[in-house]
Amino acid sequence: MSFNFADTPIPIRTEIQEAMRKEWAFLAAPGTWWSGEERVQIAAEARRAMAGERSGDELPAAVAGVVRTVAANSPLVSAEWVEGLAAKGVDMPAYAEIIGVLARLSAVDMFHRALGLPLEPLPDPEPGKPSRTPPPTNLVFGKSFVPMAIMVSIPQTVSLVPPETVAWQELSDAMYMTLGEMGNPDFRQALHRTQMELVAARTSQINECFY
């Protein structure tokens, strides 16, 4: 079974294991704009980029370039860069789905690295075509590079593709806290809320992740 964490130095909460298994199933399934095979290939390309390895040949070169830039060279991402993606065959909704896949992959992989564990093998893709469901119409440009819902929630950055928002929120609920728990300044799991936020803020600073 995936994500059993049998060799971890500390016990891993059951809800984290279940959330990661659910994420792997979602990654392998056809998405809104990318097939299951393409989604797994996107994840594999991101891992190669993070490891400093050469690009694979599964994805079109332009798509692989987008994945590698976001995964391993994010300072190059700008509003102008995102606006230019359509000319490379990657429109805004398709880009938002890539962001969703990579954001959750990063969370899972960094969790393993922090525990000194090998990365979980990527899932086998499921057959089927992407749904091509049109994006919502009530989205706006704010400080983001893609249109999004007007909500104070990081997963809403991919609200062009609602299933990606749902998947991101579910993983965040297990690995961090739920939206309801965020309203409690005295929330505690293994760490108190203030300790959790200190770790989160320091990690964001080191990674130059500002929002």
Residue locations for each model-derived region?
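Hydrophobic alpha-helical segments
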Residues: M1-Y211
